[in-house]
Swiss-Prot record:
Signal peptide: none annotated. Keywords: Lyase. Gene3D superfamilies: PSTPO5379-like (3.40.1640.10), PSTPO5379-like domain (3.30.2040.10). Belongs to the D-glutamate cyclase family. It comes from the Bacteria. The lineage of its organism: Bacteria, Bacillati, Actinomycetota, Actinomycetes, Mycobacteriales. This is Putative hydro-lyase cgR_2449. InterPro entries: D-Glu_cyclase (IPR009906), Putative_hydro-lyase (IPR038021), UPF0317 (IPR016938). GO terms for molecular function: lyase activity.
Length: 264
């Protein structure tokens, strides 16, 4: 199975059938997305949180309370279901992780408002096309992710620290990585930090908070991008009564072409 050539519809069907694996490298050319669903009475707070923190929380679409599919799935929108079509989910109650199921159907409520947020997996295909190596993708692993010491701007009852994803990039190609990813602001855009991880509160780069440990080659430099797992750090900090999210690195694959998010 060549995961890069699988259509978004086929990918969602496989995940709906129970396949659990990270989605880096899947359905090349199409945007991937983070998910967070929260009770309607917290929806405005989260919308404001995202507006105040656009690097980690670039909103692609907001669904009405109870809705389970959106326009980002294109002509296949009615076929898609955000409760089943990510490979794995996380269920939080009062900030505690209580389950990591393959389907969120059993926890779904009609008052949940869902936010679909851009994911940096979207710009990995353009990076590869330009010859910039993406180490975790090459190895079939999940991207490393870390909670930093950088506080997000709070909104209402919601607050938390920035989460970043890491890609080890050859020093000679860091400028290329910045140039390529800066053209995709809707999926986190340019890096937020390059170099010494301790400057953003990461004590051990080999022990990520989410995902797999990083892979590197001699001459690689750590490059960090804002990450859509930031809302999960916010959930753990703010402790809302219920939140449903994707599992880190296990994204919703949309029908939106990645070039649609590229700016000049």
């Amino acid at each position: 199975m060549n995961r890069s050539t699988i259509s978004p519809v086929e990918a969602r069907q496989q995940f709906r059938a129970g396949l659990i694996q990270p989605t880096s490298g899947w359905s090349a050319g199409f945007a991937q997305a983070n998910l967070i669903s929260m009770p309607q009475d917290l929806a405005y707070d989260f919308l404001l949180f995202a507006q105040r923190n656009p690097k980690p929380c670039p909103i692609l679409e907001v669904l009405n309370a109870g809705e389970t599919f959106g326009g980002i799935f294109g002509s296949n929108a009615t076929e898609a279901d955000i409760r089943t079509d990510a490979p794995q989910y996380r269920i939080y109650e009062h900030g505690e992780l209580i389950d990591s199921p393959a389907s969120a159907v059993d926890y779904w409520r009609d008052d949940l408002v869902s936010f679909i947020i851009g994911c940096s997996f979207t710009f990995e295909h353009p990076m590869v096309q330009a010859g910039v190596p993406v180490r975790h993708l090459e190895a079939g692993r999940n991207v490393p992710m870390y909670e930093t010491s950088l506080a997000c701007r709070p909104a209402g009852s919601l607050s938390g620290n920035l989460v970043v994803s890491l890609r080890m990039i050859p020093a000679s190609q860091v400028a290329d990585a910045v140039r390529i990813t800066s053209r995709y602001p809707a999926v986190h855009g340019a890096p937020v930090h390059i170099g010494d991880p301790s400057l953003i509160g990461i004590d051990d780069i080999n022990n990520p908070d989410f995902g797999d440990a990083p892979l590197s080659e001699p001459g690689d430099v750590p490059v960090f991008w804002a990450c859509g797992v930031t809302p999960q750090a916010m959930v753990m900090s703010s402790k809302p009564p219920l939140a449903i999210t994707h599992a880190p690195g296990h994204m919703l694959i949309t029908d939106a072409p990645d070039l649609g998010f590229q700016v000049p």
